[in-house]
Structure formats: structure tokens, C-alpha cells
């Protein structure tokens, strides 16, 4: 939002636009003489003009949550109404930028103040007015054309990855009386003028949108394309869709942040919005340090990942109230890129801190607390946030589809999944990637527990798999069965040892170990394994399940004959094959390429069939 354009206390002539501070309690300020103010209206509090938002009105008293440190505000200080809700600026310049929770650009503030701290009451516009952008109007638009909300009327090449489509704000329409010719313009220049019912309106490349309002769409569509993360355990066993909602709950040190960062690095999304909401500051600085160095290959060209990423940083040492705003800022930015027809992923790390901010404000308002002191409306607030995800048909012309996928990390205290935030989140989201402390302690990463996690998008994706990877669905079912059987056998093994098991059960145990150690486990810090394309995932799983089927068949068919094949015989004769199976993951998709990896896996399958044939003979 352009805070420099908001009214200032010293410029006001009439005292009627002022209220006065009546009481201060942490981030919550009460003000009197506020008759005529609206809910969620922005106000400037005190002589240092702190940004705040009205969250309750009673008579002429307003309760305000202030997004900055309130020390020094005293009773009788002026409170200025702005007449606007908390809004964000949407236009060229968002990609690659880093904002705080109320969309103030941190790099601009730092260059202005020459300090590592944000001063109070700072006035900076969210999108720079000095940068010139190369604007190209759409070919089919000319003076006299009719245009409605959501129509694309121009294109700005923001960078080599993102074509920024300039859209008419959703609530406007009219006849074009002027459209700017191709050329360089800054974000305050008029590029379009419309006339509707005799009233003329001018538009620049920036539109302002209130964060608590959902951006309108033509219709919501069912999701049908997977969100590929590059993590085998997630893509194979618990897939999410583009336009889906996912929760990653886990205790500290389980690797939530690593999973959400690898999602933003390697997923098949066009745009990434990463919201660090109340997490440690050094995690955000790690993102800022790593992302500019990370590259991705697009059409043979190497590009920086930062070009498709926007960061909203609201770390744990920033004021609490702005945490609540940062989630809404992030989702509004995501919806804006969705309306252009892009597939957007939004990472919220972590929604627990957001809920704690709600709890603190609710406590200061003396509202009735519910479970664990959280407000009674916690579930409704979480739902209203997650429901803004989805695949949609965008408003306006030309026709286009976009999607917003939300991945919310949840940090339950002590890893307790019965915590109110976790249980409320699980009631809303469709995919649950549960992280396990025990797996993390065994250094098994990503530490997704394959027994408690689930995805409700399996059915929605069947059509996609049938079309592109026909053999995949039965493989996944089989792998899950093997892992479940292994869990059931684990108790027996602890009591009586492995030796007393049936031969087929021994095979189940060994293949489950193979799947766990060499398929589900993945080292995110190695070049060959930090990202696993889906064809490699399917190829690896297919060979492991083929080995399981052949071994079981060999044992079952020779069980009655004299020369019985047992698991120990198979292991003795197939040392080489087992070694090759467990080293399938070392194939580097970047160096070796798809064709070579597929050929190697097919060769391994052939070697396996020959080895079993010679064993049975």
C-alpha cells in the first residue's frame, strides 16, 4: 500500500477527522470521538503516525490494532482516520521484492534510513515510482473498444520468467477513450482512460485491493493437475493438486521449513509467494541468501528462482499485530497473479504464529477464550484463509485459468497434533503431510510419517495418471500395502526375531526397508536428489515393486518342491541386483537426462527378470 499518499496529521485542517487516544494496552489502542469510522478502516495513531486498523466499534469508541510498536503513545494523542481499508498495491515490481506484513518494501526502507531497523511511522510506497516499465498495449484494443473488469489491456515483461499482464480492476468497466502507445512508463503514469455513463476514469499500471476481500472470479473449477514437489514421498504417496490446500504440522527440527523451501525452489508452479509469518528471522535471511543463488532451467536458459518469487517477511521480532495482516497480504498477492492465468503456490510458515497473534489480540480485547486460550472464531478465520485457494476460471478476457495452492506449516507445541490450531487446520485442508519427530531423530528426511499422512486428492488425479503414467496407481497402492504390512510385522519381529517369520514376510520386511531407505528418504542437499522428477519416481517405484513380486512368486512357486528358494538364497544370488536397486536414486536428472535414466531402469528390470529365471532353473 502507498503509505506516502495517506493523509498526515499535520496536513489536516478540520479537527472533526481526528479522534483521540483513550487507552493503550500493548498493540491495542482505544480511541474516542471516532463516530463515523468503519470496521477495518486504516488509521494513523499518535504524533509518530503509526499505522493501525479498527477492529471494534462501540458508540464513538474505536478499538484499534496497531501494526507498529506503540511505546510512547499517550492518552490524548490524535488518531487520524484515512477512510481506506488495509490494502495492497498490485502491479509490476512485486516479483523479486521483499515486503513486511503490511507491504512496506524492506530494501527501500533500508536504503532510505541507512539502518537495519524499520523506523516507526515510515512512509514508503510499496511499488517503486522511479522504475520505468516497458508497456505494450494489447493488439485488439483501440479507442472505442468496450472493456470490463478483469480484462487484460496490456503486458509488461517484468523479467524473463514473468509476463506481467495489466488487468482492469474487477469493479470497473467502460469505453476506452485513451490507451497509451508502447513505451516506458512508471507505475504512476496513466496508461488507460475509460468513460462509463459520462464519467471518465484514469488508470495506471497499479491497482489497489483490500486484503480481507476475496478477488472475484468467473467460476471455481475442480482441480485435476498435480502440484509436483520433487520430493518422492509426497509426489508418490500423498500428492497435492494445483489449487489444493496442504498442512505440514511437525515439532521443532522436523524439517518443515526445508520442505516448504524445497517446494518454492522446485515445484511446478509459475509464481511463488513465501510468507514467513512469525518464524525466526534467520530463516528468512537464509531464504534471502539461498534463493538468489538458486537457478532453474527454462527453455534452455538458466534463470534465478528469485525472478518468480515474492517474499513477505514478518519475523518473530516484528510487532505481533502485523502477523495477522501478513497472511492476508500474501494471499492477496497470490490471487492477483492467479487472475493473470498463472499457477501460484503460497507458503505460509507458520500459521501457528498467526493463530498466536489472534490469541494475543483477542485476549487484549477481553473476549471469551476457547480451547487453550485461542479465540472461539479460530476455526472460521483459518477456513476463510484456506478457502481462498483453488483452481479458477479468471474474470475477463481473454479466457484463462489460474490456481492458488496453499501450503501451511503448523508448529504445534511439543509436536502435539491434538493442539487446537492443528486440529482446526486438519478439518479444513485436503492434504496432510505429518512430520514425525522419531524419523527426524533417525535422520530420515523428509520426515513425513507414511502411516498418519493422507491426501484426499487421489481420485481427482486418477485421470491425470491414467493419461501420463498408466502403471502408477497400482504401484502406489502396492507400496502402501507393503509399508503397512511391515508396520504390522514389526511387533512380531521385536518379540520373536526375524528368523521365525515366513519367507514371504521376510521379503516384505526387506522390500519395505528398501522402499523406506532408498525411495522415501531423500537428501535435499545433494545435486542428484534435491529434486526428483516424476518419471524417476515412477521408475524407481516400479523396479522395487517388480522385485517384490518376482521374489514372492519365486518363493511361493517352489515352496512345495525339493529345491526351495528362500529369502537367504535370493539375497545371496542377487547381491548385485539389490545394490543396483538401492542406488537407483544416484542417477542425476540434470546430468543424465530423462532418456538415459529410463533406459537404465528398463535395463535393471531386464537384469532382474534374467536373474530370477536363472535362479528358478
From Swiss-Prot:
<dbReference type="GO" id="GO:0005764">
    <property type="term" value="C:lysosome"/>
</dbReference>
<keyword id="KW-0472">Membrane</keyword>
<feature type="binding site">
    <location>
        <begin position="250"/>
        <end position="257"/>
    </location>
    <ligand>
        <name>ATP</name>
    </ligand>
</feature>
<dbReference type="GO" id="GO:0016887">
    <property type="term" value="F:ATP hydrolysis activity"/>
</dbReference>
<keyword id="KW-0968">Cytoplasmic vesicle</keyword>
<dbReference type="GO" id="GO:0000221">
    <property type="term" value="C:vacuolar proton-transporting V-type ATPase, V1 domain"/>
</dbReference>
<dbReference type="GO" id="GO:0005886">
    <property type="term" value="C:plasma membrane"/>
</dbReference>
<dbReference type="InterPro" id="IPR055190">
    <property type="entry name" value="ATP-synt_VA_C"/>
</dbReference>
<dbReference type="InterPro" id="IPR023366">
    <property type="entry name" value="ATP_synth_asu-like_sf"/>
</dbReference>
<dbReference type="InterPro" id="IPR005725">
    <property type="entry name" value="ATPase_V1-cplx_asu"/>
</dbReference>
<dbReference type="Pfam" id="PF22919">
    <property type="entry name" value="ATP-synt_VA_C"/>
</dbReference>
<dbReference type="GO" id="GO:1902600">
    <property type="term" value="P:proton transmembrane transport"/>
</dbReference>
<dbReference type="InterPro" id="IPR020003">
    <property type="entry name" value="ATPase_a/bsu_AS"/>
</dbReference>
<keyword id="KW-0597">Phosphoprotein</keyword>
<dbReference type="GO" id="GO:0006879">
    <property type="term" value="P:intracellular iron ion homeostasis"/>
</dbReference>
<dbReference type="GO" id="GO:0045851">
    <property type="term" value="P:pH reduction"/>
</dbReference>
<dbReference type="Pfam" id="PF02874">
    <property type="entry name" value="ATP-synt_ab_N"/>
</dbReference>
<keyword id="KW-0963">Cytoplasm</keyword>
<keyword id="KW-0067">ATP-binding</keyword>
<protein>
    <recommendedName>
        <fullName>V-type proton ATPase catalytic subunit A</fullName>
        <ecNumber>7.1.2.2</ecNumber>
    </recommendedName>
</protein>
<dbReference type="Pfam" id="PF00006">
    <property type="entry name" value="ATP-synt_ab"/>
</dbReference>
<dbReference type="GO" id="GO:0036295">
    <property type="term" value="P:cellular response to increased oxygen levels"/>
</dbReference>
<dbReference type="GO" id="GO:0046961">
    <property type="term" value="F:proton-transporting ATPase activity, rotational mechanism"/>
</dbReference>
<keyword id="KW-1278">Translocase</keyword>
<dbReference type="InterPro" id="IPR000194">
    <property type="entry name" value="ATPase_F1/V1/A1_a/bsu_nucl-bd"/>
</dbReference>
<dbReference type="GO" id="GO:0046034">
    <property type="term" value="P:ATP metabolic process"/>
</dbReference>
<comment type="subunit">
    <text>V-ATPase is a heteromultimeric enzyme made up of two complexes: the ATP-hydrolytic V1 complex and the proton translocation V0 complex. The V1 complex consists of three catalytic AB heterodimers that form a heterohexamer, three peripheral stalks each consisting of EG heterodimers, one central rotor including subunits D and F, and the regulatory subunits C and H. The proton translocation complex V0 consists of the proton transport subunit a, a ring of proteolipid subunits c9c'', rotary subunit d, subunits e and f, and the accessory subunits ATP6AP1/Ac45 and ATP6AP2/PRR.</text>
</comment>
<keyword id="KW-0406">Ion transport</keyword>
<dbReference type="GO" id="GO:0005524">
    <property type="term" value="F:ATP binding"/>
</dbReference>
<feature type="modified residue" description="Phosphothreonine">
    <location>
        <position position="136"/>
    </location>
</feature>
<dbReference type="InterPro" id="IPR031686">
    <property type="entry name" value="ATP-synth_a_Xtn"/>
</dbReference>
<keyword id="KW-0375">Hydrogen ion transport</keyword>
<dbReference type="GO" id="GO:0030133">
    <property type="term" value="C:transport vesicle"/>
</dbReference>
<dbReference type="InterPro" id="IPR024034">
    <property type="entry name" value="ATPase_F1/V1_b/a_C"/>
</dbReference>
<dbReference type="GO" id="GO:0030665">
    <property type="term" value="C:clathrin-coated vesicle membrane"/>
</dbReference>
<dbReference type="InterPro" id="IPR036121">
    <property type="entry name" value="ATPase_F1/V1/A1_a/bsu_N_sf"/>
</dbReference>
<keyword id="KW-0813">Transport</keyword>
<dbReference type="InterPro" id="IPR022878">
    <property type="entry name" value="V-ATPase_asu"/>
</dbReference>
<dbReference type="InterPro" id="IPR027417">
    <property type="entry name" value="P-loop_NTPase"/>
</dbReference>
<comment type="function">
    <text>Catalytic subunit of the V1 complex of vacuolar(H+)-ATPase (V-ATPase), a multisubunit enzyme composed of a peripheral complex (V1) that hydrolyzes ATP and a membrane integral complex (V0) that translocates protons. V-ATPase is responsible for acidifying and maintaining the pH of intracellular compartments and in some cell types, is targeted to the plasma membrane, where it is responsible for acidifying the extracellular environment.</text>
</comment>
<keyword id="KW-0547">Nucleotide-binding</keyword>
<dbReference type="Pfam" id="PF16886">
    <property type="entry name" value="ATP-synt_ab_Xtn"/>
</dbReference>
Amino acid at each position: 500500500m502507498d503509505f506516502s499518499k495517506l493523509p498526515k496529521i499535520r496536513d489536516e485542517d478540520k479537527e472533526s477527522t481526528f479522534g483521540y487516544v483513550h487507552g493503550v494496552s500493548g498493540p491495542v489502542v482505544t480511541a474516542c470521538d471516532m463516530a463515523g469510522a468503519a470496521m477495518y478502516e486504516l488509521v494513523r495513531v499518535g504524533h509518530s503516525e503509526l499505522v493501525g486498523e479498527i477492529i471494534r466499534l462501540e458508540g464513538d469508541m474505536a478499538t484499534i490494532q496497531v501494526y507498529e510498536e506503540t511505546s510512547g503513545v499517550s492518552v490524548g494523542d490524535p488518531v487520524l482516520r484515512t477512510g481506506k481499508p488495509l490494502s495492497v498495491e498490485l502491479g509490476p515490481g512485486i516479483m523479486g521484492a521483499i515486503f513486511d506484513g503490511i507491504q512496506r518494501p524492506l530494501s527501500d526502507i533500508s536504503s532510505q534510513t541507512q539502518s537495519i531497523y524499520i523506523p516507526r511511522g515510515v512512509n514508503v510506497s510499496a511499488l517503486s515510482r522511479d522504475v520505468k516499465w516497458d508497456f505494450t498495449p494489447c493488439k485488439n484494443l483501440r479507442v472505442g473498444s468496450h472493456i470490463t473488469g478483469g480484462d487484460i489491456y496490456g503486458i509488461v515483461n517484468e523479467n524473463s520468467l514473468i509476463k506481467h499482464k495489466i488487468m482492469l480492476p474487477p469493479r470497473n468497466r467502460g469505453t476506452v477513450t485513451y490507451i497509451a502507445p508502447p513505451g516506458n512508463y512508471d507505475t504512476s503514469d496513466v496508461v488507460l482512460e475509460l468513460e462509463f455513463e459520462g464519467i471518465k476514469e484514469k488508470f495506471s499500471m497499479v491497482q489497489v485491493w483490500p486484503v480481507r476481500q476475496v478477488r472475484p472470479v468467473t467460476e471455481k473449477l475442480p482441480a485435476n493437475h498435480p502440484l509436483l514437489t520433487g520430493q518422492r514421498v509426497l509426489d508418490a504417496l500423498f500428492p497435492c493438486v494445483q489449487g489444493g490446500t496442504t498442512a505440514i504440522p511437525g515439532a521443532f527440527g522436523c524439517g518443515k521449513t526445508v520442505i516448504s523451501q524445497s517446494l518454492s525452489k522446485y515445484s511446478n508452479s509459475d509464481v511463488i509467494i513465501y510468507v514467513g509469518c512469525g518464524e525466526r528471522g534467520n530463516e528468512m535471511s537464509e531464504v534471502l541468501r539461498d534463493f538468489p543463488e538458486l537457478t532453474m532451467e527454462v527453455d534452455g536458459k538458466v534463470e534465478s528462482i528469485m525472478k518468480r518469487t515474492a517474499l513477505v517477511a514478518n519475523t518473530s521480532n516484528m510487532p505481533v499485530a502485523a502477523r495477522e495482516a501478513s497472511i492476508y497480504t500474501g494471499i492477496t498477492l497470490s490471487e492477483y497473479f492467479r487472475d493473470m492465468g498463472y499457477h501460484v503456490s503460497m507458503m505460509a510458515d507458520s500459521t501457528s504464529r498467526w493463530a498466536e497473534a489472534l490469541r494475543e489480540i483477542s485476549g487484549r480485547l477481553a473476549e471469551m477464550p476457547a480451547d487453550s486460550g485461542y479465540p472461539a472464531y479460530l476455526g472460521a478465520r483459518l477456513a476463510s484463509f484456506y478457502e481462498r485457494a483453488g483452481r479458477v476460471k479468471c474474470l475477463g478476457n481473454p479466457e484463462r485459468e489460474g490456481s492458488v495452492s496453499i501450503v501451511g506449516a503448523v508448529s504445534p507445541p511439543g509436536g502435539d497434533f491434538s493442539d487446537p490450531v492443528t486440529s482446526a487446520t486438519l478439518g479444513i485442508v485436503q492434504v496432510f503431510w505429518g512430520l514425525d519427530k522419531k524419523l527426524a531423530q533417525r535422520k530420515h528426511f523428509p520426515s513425513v510419517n507414511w502411516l498418519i499422512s493422507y491426501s484426499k486428492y487421489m481420485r481427482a488425479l486418477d485421470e491425470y495418471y491414467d493419461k501420463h503414467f498408466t502403471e502408477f496407481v497400482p504401484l502406489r497402492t502396492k507400496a502402501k500395502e507393503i509399508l503397512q504390512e511391515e508396520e504390522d510385522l514389526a511387533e512380531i519381529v521385536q518379540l520373536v526375531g526375524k528368523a521365525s517369520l515366513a519367507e514371504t514376510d521376510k521379503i516384505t520386511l526387506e522390500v519395505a526397508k528398501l522402499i523406506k531407505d532408498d525411495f522415501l528418504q531423500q537428501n535435499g542437499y545433494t545435486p542428484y536428489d534435491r529434486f526428483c522428477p516424476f518419471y524417476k519416481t515412477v521408475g524407481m517405484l516400479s523396479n522395487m515393486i517388480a522385485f517384490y513380486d518376482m521374489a514372492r512368486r519365486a518363493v511361493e512357486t517352489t515352496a512345495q518342491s525339493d529345491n526351495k528358494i528362500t529369502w537367504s538364497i535370493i539375497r545371496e544370488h542377487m547381491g548385485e541386483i539389490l545394490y543396483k536397486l538401492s542406488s537407483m536414486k544416484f542417477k542425476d536428472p540434470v546430468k543424465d537426462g530423462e532418456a538415459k535414466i529410463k533406459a537404465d531402469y528398463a535395463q535393471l528390470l531386464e537384469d532382474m527378470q534374467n536373474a530370477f529365471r536363472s535362479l528358478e532353473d
